[in-house]
Regions:
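Beta-propeller blade termini and top-face loops
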Residues: 32-768
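Intrinsically disordered, polybasic Lys/Arg-rich low-complexity tracts
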Residues: 4-19
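Cationic, low-complexity basic patches in intrinsically disordered or flexible, solvent-exposed regions
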Residues: 24
Length: 768
């Protein structure tokens, strides 16, 4: 991001001041003013749920489309082997800068969390838990989430989909890479890992390339009678009807994961396997759920160790309606089973098909959901169920929120409320992906969700978040307050816009709720901030006051934007630009907005740059790869002057030289081409300055330090790199940085540090 990204605006009338959102804040006793920095910033509104599921239903899909445009379009998902290969190549080919000897360090948040996909616990010591993060690797806690440590830092892939622990040998843990949550930001993996020492070290046991196992592993099941008998389930392409050899489905190993065989009784082509459960007391009995968008979807059972399978249909809806389905079997009475199923036939494939109960080992089923789940949605994304270890009628399940029955489904009650304040005992983060109730502590409930780990010690009545120390936040962008050395933050996936006003990694708080968006600080006043979330909604913060200053665009225009880019005029922080498929500008700090451009190329605006050297020059790029400019501060606009030199994919970031407004740099998303380009004439002509030196991965961030205009910093899926413009040589700044995608770069002048926001491992700092 340009260094002027730290420029920001103010607010006018006071609206509402919300109480603290529960994270630790070092303030002067309730005024919102931080003692160390002197900055006052009170939280704005959390994203509230409207009646019915419609508000939240589209979020993960809208996010997916936005994410895909910046990472993989026109293909469905990132070629993960290309990422690994390119990262390895540049580590060897590009040297580190000789003048930088310090190491990257994580600067938070460590108290916010991020998307977790799975959780397991030690069978004899339920306080010892391991979780997998969608973009942050595997983490271990010895004390039920009070403290955390990661031993996954140096692995080539941080995208985790499933964990399983061998009950007979608890030091043996399996990890399936590649998230299987059916959104386009569910990044693929490279195969199945194994640890023989309780998660301290890991080895790649079975690679997807060698064995053909799925690139998105969502479940690992270990036979309780034979630890060498493993089953895994996963997804391949995002649509099961697609062809190719990157198949999902169920895979079987009888030699502890060395070799694998794909089951084809559902389909020889692509299908999904969501849940696999071994009968706890009956040898060779296995249950599993599948989706193939046809008559063979649903719940299946084998009674001979997997040689033959029977489709269980009695009392269940038409098989073709079964989408993602989670399965649970009672440990105290294995005849009782529950299934929590997504309706593949619903309009957006996100609604609940039903909660189904069997009292006879799966022979017959009954829908016990009633009308309770009418407002529950997004079941293809968050989908999990668990049965109490000692009470087969005590069941917890859910997606966005969690729901409880204590009488086998006769009645239900909602037990978590994501739209409450974070310090409310009924609050747990939204989008639940895995539930665990340890046999040794049957009333303890662990929930792995988009906010990290929530824990109940009383069977779900009250909840606390146990994510402190779990630095797995998935950022979209970040900014720093240039007037303070202690204030910075960013917009995060499903964790709002979060900031710290003390410089402490453990004192972040939620400034704005929901999915975080763009954040921009006023360069002269750290207490003045703009922040956005989806659908062009923009809020302005002035210390203790906040105000909705969303541009007056038609609803159809707002709905076309997942995350609105915001930037300030470097010469006047009261002049702010944002965009949908056209450019909006305010000259009075957000009080009034005007659409200053026509529709550009029909796609969403991806970046806006107001040149510090001449603020009349405004450059705009789009998701379709378009490039437009205004020479009069936004009054008039050029046609699309994107050059054939540019690849035609999303231009993710624009940056101009602090000394020359005509010198423009651009980064481009996706794979298969160069990614960094320079124009010396304001975008009329372009040249490739990547020249194959940089990794062929999506690029997201650009930065020129005002103190060092001869260097250009870029952030991409493989790390951080710097160009010496005089020599044309690139250098690698990635040493000691986790293998997570770097989505934003900002230089913090007062702290003399480069900050990198990652999608999965929080924010990191490199001191100069």
């Amino acid at each position: 991001m340009p260094t002027q990204k730290g420029k920001k605006a103010a607010a006018t009338k006071k609206t509402v001041r919300r109480k603290s959102s529960g994270q630790q804040r070092e303030t002067d006793g309730g005024t919102g003013k931080n003692v160390a920095s002197g900055v006052t910033l009170a939280p704005g509104p959390r994203k509230k749920r409207a009646k019915g599921p419609s508000v939240r239903l589209s979020n993960h899909k809208a996010r997916s489309v936005w994410f895909q445009a910046r990472t993989t379009w026109p293909v469905r998902e990132a070629p993960v082997r290309t990422l690994v290969r390119e990262r390895t190549r540049v580590q060897k080919a590009l040297a580190a800068p000789a003048n930088i000897t310090s190491n990257w360090e994580c600067v938070g948040p460590t108290n916010i969390g991020g998307r977790l996909t799975c959780i397991v616990c030690h069978p004899q010591h339920p306080e010892r838990i391991w979780v997998g993060a969608a973009g942050g690797g595997v983490w271990q806690s010895p004390d039920s989430g009070q403290t955390w440590q990661s031993f996954w830092h140096d692995q080539e892939i941080l995208n985790i989909g499933a964990l399983a622990i061998d009950a007979k040998k608890p030091d043996t843990i399996y990890c399936g890479t590649g998230e299987a949550n059916l959104s386009l930001d569910s990044y693929p993996g490279v195969g199945l890992y194994q640890s023989a020492d309780g998660g301290h070290t890991w080895q790649l046991l079975a690679s997807t390339d060698r064995t053909g196992i799925p690139r998105h592993i969502g479940v690992i099941a270990i036979d309780p009678f034979d630890s060498k008998h493993l089953l895994i389930g996963g997804v391949g392409y995002s649509e099961v009807s697609q062809t190719g050899n990157d198949y999902g489905g169920m895979f079987v190993s009888v030699d502890a994961g060395v070799t694998w065989r794909r089951e084809t009784f559902i389909s020889a082509k692509n299908y999904w396997c969501h849940s696999i459960v071994f009968h706890p007391t009956k040898k060779n009995t296995i249950f599993a759920t599948f989706t193939e968008q046809g008559a063979r979807s649903g719940i299946w059972r084998s009674t001979d160790g997997g040689k033959n399978w029977t489709h269980l249909t009695s009392g269940l809806p038409d098989a073709a309606r079964f989408g993602r389905t989670s399965l649970a079997i009672s440990r105290s009475n294995p005849q009782v089973m529950f299934a929590f199923a997504n309706d593949e036939a619903s309009g957006n494939k996100d609604l609940l098909l039903g909660v189904f109960r069997s009292a006879n080992g799966g022979n017959t089923w009954k829908d016990v959901s009633g009308t309770h789940f009418a407002d529950e949605g997004q079941i293809s994304y968050g989908n999990t169920i668990v049965i109490h270890p000692t009470n087969p009628d005590h069941v917890i399940c859910g997606g966005v929120d969690l729901h409880l029955t204590k009488n086998g489904g006769k009645t239900w009650v909602q037990i978590t409320h994501w739209d409450l304040e974070r310090d409310d005992p009924k609050y747990a983060h939204a989008d639940h992906h895995a539930l665990l109730m340890p046999a040794a502590v049957p009333d303890r409930v662990y929930s792995a969700n988009d906010g990290g780990l929530d824990v109940s010690e009383n069977a779900g009545r009250t909840w606390t978040n146990r994510s402190n120390g779990l630095s797995v936040t998935m950022f979209y962008d970040m900014d720093v307050a240039q007037s303070s050395g202690l204030v910075y933050g960013g917009g995060a996936q499903d964790n709002g816009t979060v900031i710290t006003t003390s410089g402490s990694s453990s004192s972040f708080f939620e400034l704005l709720g929901g999915d975080g968006g763009w954040i921009v600080f006023n360069p002269l006043d750290a207490g003045r901030v703009y922040a956005s979330y989806y659908n062009l909604h923009i809020y302005r913060f002035r210390g203790d006051e906040f105000k909705n200053v969303t541009p007056p665009a038609p609803a159809s225009e707002k709905n076309s934007v997942w995350m609105a880019y915001i930037t300030l005029d470097p010469s006047d922080p009261n002049t702010v630009f944002t965009g949908s498929f056209r450019v909006w500008r305010t000259r009075n700090d957000g009080n009034n907005w005007v659409a200053v451009s026509p529709t550009l190329d029909g796609s969403s605006i991806s970046a806006i740059e107001v040149a510090p050297a001449d603020t009349k020059r405004v450059y705009v790029s789009t998701e379709n790869g378009g490039f437009f400019r205004s020479l009069d501060g936004g009054g008039t606009w050029s046609p699309n002057i994107s050059s054939s030199i540019l690849p035609g994919h999303t231009i993710t970031r624009l940056e101009t030289s602090p000394k020359d407004a005509r010198l423009v740099f651009a980064t481009v998303a996706n794979f298969g081409h160069s990614h960094v380009f320079r124009s010396a004439d304001g975008g009329t002509t372009w040249e490739d300055i990547d020249r194959g030196q940089l990794p062929d991965v999506p690029h997201h961030a650009l930065l020129i330090r005002e103190e060092e205009t001869g260097k250009l910093y870029v952030g991409n899926d493989a790390g951080v790199f710097v160009l010496d413009m005089a020599s044309g040589m690139w250098m690698n700044l990635t040493k000691n940085l986790p293998n997570a995608m770097v989505v934003d770069l900002v230089y913090h002048t007062k702290d003399a540090a480069l900050l990198a926001a990652t999608y999965g491992r929080s924010i990191w700092r490199l001191k100069f």
